Structures are given as C-alpha cells and as structure tokens.
Amino acid sequence: MFLSDEIPILANLPVDREYADIYFLHDIHFGSELFDEKKWETLKSAILSDENSYICIVGDVFENAIPNSKSDMFSQTHSPAEQKDWAIQQLKDLSHKILEVVSGNHESNRTTKVCGLFPLYDCCLIAGIGEKYRETIAFIDIAVGRYRGNSHKQMHYFGQIQHKAKDLRSYHSSDYTDGIDFFASGHDHEAKDKPRAKLVFDKHNKVIYKRNVECINCGSFCKFGGYGSKNAYRPQSDKMYRLRLYGNEKRMETTGFYL
C-alpha cells in the first residue's frame, strides 16, 4: 500500500545544480474532450530538455468519468482504462523528473469512493515511482545545490502539496503547517501566485520575524467549455508558474509564463 501522508518525501537533487525549477502539474484531465494536448506536450518537452526542471504532480491527471460522477461519461475521448494507460506512459517518461504525486478528486472521489481502488497509485507503481505517491497531502523536503559553496551542505526547502485548498482572506491551508517554504494546490483551475506570510517567534533569539510562503496554483490543461460553461463559470487564465529554488542561498522566485 502507499505510504502515509505523514511520511515526508526527501528529494535530494544533484549538488552541482545552482537552482531547481519546480513545475506543479495538475488538472490535466486526460480523457476529457477539453484536454489541451498541445499545451501538455509543449511543457513536457520543455521540462525533459532542461536538466534543472523537476515536477510535482498535484492530482486530476485523468478525467475518469464513471457512473454518478459529475463528468459526462459519453463525451470522454478515452475510456478510464485507456486513461490509466496514458498516465502510466507519461509517468514513465517523466519518472526521473517527478519528485512527488498526490491524487485529486477525479481519482479519489470517484474510483476510490466507489470501489476502494486508487488508480493514480496504480499508475505510479507500474511506472516505478510508487514511493513518491501520497493520497491526500505530500510534505516534501527538496535539497538543491551547495550552500555557500559548502559541498557537504545543501540548501533545503520544505513544501506542502495537496489538490484542494482553502483560500480565504484571513486563512489559507498553508497556515496549518509550520515551517513550510512553499505550498501548491489545484482543483479550481484558477492560476494564481498568491504568496502568504506569518509571524514566527524565534524562541532562541527572542525575536519575532516574518516568514514568507509561496502559494501557487498552476491552473489546468483544459480548454474552455463543457462543465464550466454549462454552469456559467468564467474562462480561466492559461498562465502557468514555475518555482525556482536556489542552491547557494535561501531564495525563491515564482515566475509566470504562457505556452
């Protein structure tokens, strides 16, 4: 069975990397008639060609429309079984780039809820990355580069990754985990870079300081239409984000881009 969410993922990247670019990929929805194959293939190719690029997968890899789900089974371009085959191949192709995988509602609220199976975990197992899967929340420690040239010490960044998140004016899901540097979520298809901050008491030095947390949602790989337009939802931006983690000093940069 898959590892508990409470077991953090330790991702030790090569020490010769000056930085690592992290892409949070989610709401891909392969099998949906709205799946944007060109967008997916363009980004996949760019990531594979860049040694500094890595991936965190944040759920809803496939559409997985089944009886009694909100999605339309009859408009799917591939059956759920074919969608799993596609996901397995993508995970295999990107296995050396993937740092973690969490499931989304199109996996856990459908197949898992109806029959107790975990389709995305199955895909990870077959692709040889089962240890990187977490069912709901992934806590990940990413080590990159050499801290100030010290070959024995890497720069570490701690993150929390989950498909759904609360994002209110005075509260965010990132608030309930101390010590994180970044938080990534998806689900609502709304691309946004919305950093948060909290005050922290340093009990050793007896001072209060502000800790910044990068909070990122990378939208989706869906075109407009279908369920969204039928329910009067507005079109969502195609913008995506990459999080750059530097290896020689504790510094993060979130950059937006279009494909």
Language model regions located:
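Glycine- and charge-rich intrinsically disordered segments
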Residues: M1-D16, N150-S151, T255
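Beta-strand-turn-beta hairpins that frame and shape the catalytic cleft
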Residues: N12-Y23, F139-G159, K210-V213
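Alpha-helix termini
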Residues: I47-L48, G128, V144-S151, L199-I208
